[in-house]
């Protein structure tokens, strides 16, 4: 079964609202073996919507729409779909009563505009909406299926999970399963080069790399007639990829880098403190996202000025004068200083030039040092990046977490 997702709403085209519906529906369809061939976004215009439906059904047998089911005049999805399928809109008394009851919960009375939401194509299956006043519906005709859903995610997602998935599962016999591997320390092009044989010879499963800030993900996707068989197809490909990429793979699924690092610290009961200059607390903020980190994360210091580095971290004045604050020597003294001050096993520091000003020929914007102290041993890493201030600060945090992860192995 081939599907298209058609999201309706001028607010989507204007960028006022992020289209999370398409992402959610695509993932859910993949889990039950339905392939999504196209995403479309269209404004609240009946003629354009009719043209989109005609185009979509030229190559798909399933079209799922979201949005345009509200009570106002520019909510035209229902009318457009009825016209496409050459169906009259008729009043559905049960839906009318449910809408009225729903409105009473908000101390509102039924209006003619709200009454519009109780009209549906004559031959359709109505999907109740316990979370709003816009029921959805399913219409089948001439080997075409249209599933019409409300736009707000808190209304659409429960309807999709409870009504749409059971309906679609009866129509398909295949299952698509995916596994995501998370990689950091090497870029997307390097990943693609290292696993080029796998990428060039893929059939089922397929392997697709995706670049994100500071990391690359690999999605391995298999299709079979059962979930178990699909997962079994993934196993040998995943094993081969892990052998090639080794510890550049830090996790899988929805696991974050900070979660992996925090788990190591907690499991090994290694206490940590952070000393940050250019990242200004972002590194500490990432670590404390993890529940339970309070047992090992003792302290975070933002030492932006030279004076605070000297007074708070015991960085030597002579070191600052000789090497400047942006140097491996200062990064190491910062890491050791915070660890000894806080009494922790680990101290980690960041110092650098995040921009947009402050760079020199010798210390350009994007020059970063990460210092690390682990139970008496010290390590330092130099980084050079180009980009805006936010990017440089964020990528520094990612690299600092990865530097710590690799040195804890």
Swiss-Prot record:
Q: Which organism is it from?
A: Clostridium botulinum (strain ATCC 19397 / Type A)
Looking at the Swiss-Prot or TrEMBL record, what is one Pfam family this protein matches? MoCF_biosynth
NCBIfam families attached here?
cinA_nterm (TIGR00200), molyb_syn (TIGR00177), PncC_domain (TIGR00199), PRK00549.1 (NF001813)
Please name the HAMAP family in this protein's record.
CinA_B
Q: Which SUPFAM superfamilies match?
A: CinA-like, Molybdenum cofactor biosynthesis proteins
Gene that encodes it: cinA
Which residues are in coiled coils? none
Family, as annotated: Belongs to the CinA family.
What's the protein name? Answer: Putative competence-damage inducible protein
């Amino acid at each position: 079964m081939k599907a298209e997702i058609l999201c309706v709403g001028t607010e989507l085209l204007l960028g006022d609202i992020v289209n999370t519906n398409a992402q959610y529906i695509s993932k859910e369809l993949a889990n039950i073996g339905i392939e999504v061939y196209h995403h479309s976004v269209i404004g609240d215009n009946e003629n354009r919507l009719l043209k989109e439906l005609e185009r979509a059904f030229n190559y798909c047998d399933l079209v799922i729409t979201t949005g345009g089911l509200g009570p106002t005049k520019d909510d035209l999805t229902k009318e457009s779909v009825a016209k496409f399928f050459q169906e009259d809109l008729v009043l559905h008394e049960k839906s009318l009563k449910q809408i009225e009851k729903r409105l009473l919960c908000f101390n509102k009375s039924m209006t003619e505009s709200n009454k519009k939401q109780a009209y549906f194509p004559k031959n359709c299956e109505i999907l109740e909406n316990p979370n709003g006043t816009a029921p959805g519906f399913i219409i089948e005709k001439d080997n075409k299926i249209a599933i019409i859903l409300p736009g707000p995610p808190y209304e659409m997602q429960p309807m999709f999970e409870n009504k749409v998935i059971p309906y679609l599962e009866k129509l398909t016999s295949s299952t698509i399963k995916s596994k995501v591997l998370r990689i950091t320390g090497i870029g997307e092009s390097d990943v693609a080069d290292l696993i080029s044989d796998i990428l060039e010879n893929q059939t089922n499963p397929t392997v697709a790399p995706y670049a994100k800030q500071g990391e690359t993900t690999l999605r391995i996707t298999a299709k079979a007639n059962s979930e178990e068989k699909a997962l079994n197809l993934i196993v040998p490909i995943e094993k081969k990829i892990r052998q090639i990429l080794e510890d550049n793979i830090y996790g899988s699924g929805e696991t974050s880098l900070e979660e992996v690092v925090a788990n190591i610290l907690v499991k090994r009961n290694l206490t940590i403190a952070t000393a940050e200059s250019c990242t200004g607390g972002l590194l500490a903020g990432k670590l404390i996202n993890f529940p339970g980190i309070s047992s090992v994360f003792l302290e975070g210091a933002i030492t932006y000025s030279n004076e605070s580095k000297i007074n708070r971290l015991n960085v030597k004045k002579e070191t600052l004068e000789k090497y400047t604050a942006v140097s491996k020597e200062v990064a190491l003294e910062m890491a050791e200083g915070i660890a000894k001050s806080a009494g922790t096993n680990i101290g980690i520091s960041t110092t650098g030039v995040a921009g947009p000003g402050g760079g020199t020929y010798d210390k350009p914007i994007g020059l970063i040092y990460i210092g690390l102290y682990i139970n008496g041993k010290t390590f330092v890493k130099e980084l050079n990046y180009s980009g805006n201030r936010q990017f440089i600060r964020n990528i520094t945090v990612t690299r600092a977490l990865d530097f710590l992860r690799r040195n804890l192995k």
